[in-house]
UniProtKB/Swiss-Prot annotation:
UniProt protein name: Glycine--tRNA ligase beta subunit
Entries under InterPro entries matching the protein: DALR_anticod-bd, Gly-tRNA-synth_bsu, Gly-tRNA-synth_heterodimer
Subunit note: Tetramer of two alpha and two beta subunits.
Listed GO MF terms: arginine-tRNA ligase activity; ATP binding; glycine-tRNA ligase activity
Reaction(s) catalysed (UniProt annotation): tRNA(Gly) + glycine + ATP = glycyl-tRNA(Gly) + AMP + diphosphate
Swiss-Prot/TrEMBL keywords: Aminoacyl-tRNA synthetase, ATP-binding, Cytoplasm, Ligase, Nucleotide-binding, Protein biosynthesis
Family: Belongs to the class-II aminoacyl-tRNA synthetase family.
Entry-linked SUPFAM superfamilies: HD-domain/PDEase-like (SSF109604)
ATP-binding found in the keyword field: yes
Length: 706
């Protein structure tokens, strides 16, 4: 067995694209080797990446494919042999199979007798396969954006390819791509090592060889190095700690090859600015880590990750340069904050008429009006359900929510939209409920983010997003495939998350009603089915990927209705709790069998399954087993319905499971599809009656046996 190393050296790759590309390259190489039967049992795949390279190391690679014996079938025997002598057809087939005519065999098939031959297919060498296949795998790697860099050449890639390494053991495989031929030579850190080539003696020495050339190719090792350096440098400031920011750690990990960390400072006067502004400037614009004191308050320091290992003299120069840049950014922020206060948010509302939301949907002023109407309807629904809402604060927050788009601070630091509005609202004397709702309006931006902490903030977020979704669908801008230019999936994810985690008494139907009735877009309700399917798809995603419910549990509860998000999740929780019990598993299997019987009967009759009657004639139940099932179901149905009405779904499901003896006996003793039409129809009606009576919590036929 051998090890295989493949590296692509590039000009600097955008940091946000590296992780996915590293994973895809490793997957493609491993799948290629697996597909070609070149991987031994116990093989391992290791991925590497830096801003200038993607690499994969595979152990347990066979030198060649095993020879394979193939059974080939040729022409009919009567055509291949005449009077016992081979014809040209037999000779041609023997030549194709690579055997002598005498080795041909008679093969009997259902279609008759044919000529057959056993042929040994010689396994190809691994280096031959890799040389041929790797260029296609490289070209197939997905990048959000590609570029051409060789005039008149067809290759596209994220950045120009500078070098490649392809080693099978110590053997170089001269793979060619984009005018570059692979060798056993890579390059170290651009500054710390220079342009001198670095020879890789063997695949297993890849990481160590690069380490000596001041490149840490292993991403996790680099991430650990950065975190360790952050801890170490922060300890030089008494009582300080760096503010945890995993996303920023990840970003700088993909921006560096040999990272180190430098501490800088800024004037304490800037701490008068809101912390959110300071942290955004440091994190989003400069890739600096914030430093806080023991109480968790921002300290006048920052940490920056460098892609070098500077001397003390160089570090002082770099520190001074970073401090100067940050000081300028903070001065800008302070200036914008001061200038913006001269016009209140309330006086900025009319300015939204000149800020376009979408060319077909009008300005943000119109958007605000639509959101307000939706919010009024949602507020009424919540109050009707017995929950108190500060409607005045909600509507004031809606009115002012988008006004910060006209501020200089948001124009310069767009990441702060919403947050700036909330801060300005508080500074200008708006109520705390108003300020909080505005501040949190864009949360959650991802499934990891919290929902707004106040009911008013939750309703503002819902009204804003559902209005956008409905109107975008109405003008034909729904997401397609991987394209979602208006982030409607993110908006729908937020709708589901707010409804679920806020436990809001608002159904998806009523949510869409509010948006459709409030929209000024013609035929806003025309896309209702599409929008509802879209929201249910996001609910399915949330339940499976965020809450972690099994796919069959999710399918089962969604099939029974998904208009109430909170209720749907409660049913999934109850179903998850009982699905493993023996009685419930048997009931689920019986329901699956029942559904199959009804489907087959409906197909045979040429009608829809739902149209089959559930009206049972008790006088046409001659078998004791079917009588017992009918009586038990009729007695149990109101009990289950009462528990369901109380939302006691677990107890309801446990009651349904008590029907197992009667269900088992029915299928053991009763033939449903009998010749007698009346009897058959009545038994089908009994099955339909049982299914309809006990499927309002979940469609148990969706449950898969563990």
């Amino acid at each position: 067995m051998a090890e295989f190393l493949f590296e692509i050296g590039l000009e600097e790759i955008p940091a946000r694209m590296i992780a996915a590309a590293e994973s895809e390259l490793a997957r493609r190489v491993a799948e290629l080797l697996q597909r070609e039967d070149l991987l031994a049992e116990g093989h391992a795949v290791t991925r590497y990446s830096t801003p200038r390279r993607l690499a994969v190391l595979v152990t347990g690679v066979k030198a060649a494919q095993a020879d394979r014996e193939e059974q080939l079938t040729g022409p009919a025997w009567s055509i291949a042999f005449k009077d016992g002598q081979p014809t040209p057809a037999a000779q041609a087939f023997a030549k194709k199979a690579g055997v002598e005519v005498a080795a041909l065999q008679k093969v009997t098939t259902p279609k008759g007798e044919y000529v057959g031959a056993s042929s040994v297919r010689k396994g190809r060498a691994a280096n031959e396969i890799l040389l041929e296949a790797l260029p296609k795998e490289i070209a197939a790697i997905y990048w959000p954006k590609n570029m051409y860099w060789r005039a008149g050449k067809p290759e596209r890639f994220v950045r120009p390819v500078q070098w490649m390494v392809a080693l099978l053991g110590e053997q170089v495989i001269p793979v060619e791509f984009a005018g570059v031929t692979a060798a056993n030579v890579t390059y170290g850190h651009r500054i710390l090592h220079g342009d001198a080539p670095v020879a890789i003696p063997a695949p297993m020495e890849y990481a160590a060889t690069l380490e000596a050339a001041k490149v840490q190719a292993d991403v996790e090792a680099r991430r650990h190095r950065i975190r360790k350096a952050l801890d170490h440098v922060t300890r030089t400031v008494p009582g300080a700690r760096w503010r945890e920011d995993e996303a920023l750690v990840d970003a700088v990990t993909h921006l560096t090859e040999w990272p180190s960390v430098l501490l800088g400072s800024f004037e304490t006067e800037f701490l008068a600015l809101p912390e959110e502004v300071l942290v955004t400037v440091m994190r989003d614009h400069q890739k600096y880590f914030a430093v806080e004191d023991a109480a968790g308050k921002l300290a006048p320091h920052f940490l920056t990750a460098l892609n070098t290992e500077p001397s003390d003299q160089a570090a002082a120069i770099i520190r001074h340069g970073n401090e100067r840049v940050l000081r300028a950014r903070f001065n800008d922020a302070r200036f914008f904050w001061t200038v913006d206060q001269k016009i209140s948010l309330a006086n900025r509302l009319e300015m939204l008429q000149s800020v376009t939301f979408h060319k077909e949907l009008g300005s943000y002023h119109q958007k605000t009006h639509t959101t307000r109407e939706i919010a009024v309807k949602l507020s009424a629904q919540v109050r009707h359900a017995g929950t108190s809402v500060d409607e005045a604060a909600l509507l004031r927050a809606v009115e002012l929510a988008k006004t910060d788009l006209t501020t200089e601070l948001v124009k310069e630091f767009t990441e702060l939209q919403g947050i700036v509005g909330g801060l300005y609202a508080r500074a200008q004397g708006e109520g705390e409920a108003v300020a909080q709702a505005i501040y949190w309006q864009y949360s959650p931006a991802s499934m990891d983010d919290p929902i707004p902490p106040t009911l008013e903030g939750q309703l503002l977020g819902l009204a804003d997003r559902i209005g956008t979704i409905v109107e975008m669908f109405a003008i034909g801008l729904e997401p397609t495939g991987s394209k979602d230019p208006f982030a409607l999936r993110r908006a729908a994810n937020a709708v589901v998350k707010i409804l679920a985690e806020g436990k809001l008494p608002v159904t998806l139907d009523r949510l869409l009603n509010a948006a459709e009735e409030s929209s000024k877009v013609e035929n806003a309700a025309a896309s209702r089915e599409k929008v509802m399917a879209f929201l249910k798809e996001r609910l399915e995603f949330y339940m499976r990927e965020v809450l972690g419910y099994r796919y069959d549990v999710v399918n089962a509860v969604l099939a029974a209705g998904a208009h109430d998000v909170v209720d749907t999740i409660a049913r999934a929780e109850a179903l998850s709790a009982v699905r493993g019990s023996e009685d419930f598993a048997a009931i689920a299997a019986a329901f699956k069998r029942s559904k199959n019987i009804l489907r087959q009967a409906a197909e045979k009759a040429g009608v829809a399954e739902d149209s089959l009657s559930a009206d049972v004639d008790a006088a046409l139940l001659p078998e004791p087993a079917e009588k017992q099932l009918h009586e038990a179901a009729a007695k149990l149905a109101p009990v289950v319905e009462e528990l369901r009405a109380k939302n006691d779904y677990r107890a309801a499901l446990e009651q349904i499971a008590t029907l197992r003896p009667q269900v088992d006996l029915f299928f053991d003793k009763v033939m449903v599809m009998v010749e007698d039409d009346l009897l058959r129809h009545n038994r089908l009606a009994l099955i339909q009656y049982v299914l309809r009576s006990f499927s309002s919590i979940a469609d148990f036929s969706e449950i898969v046996a563990s």
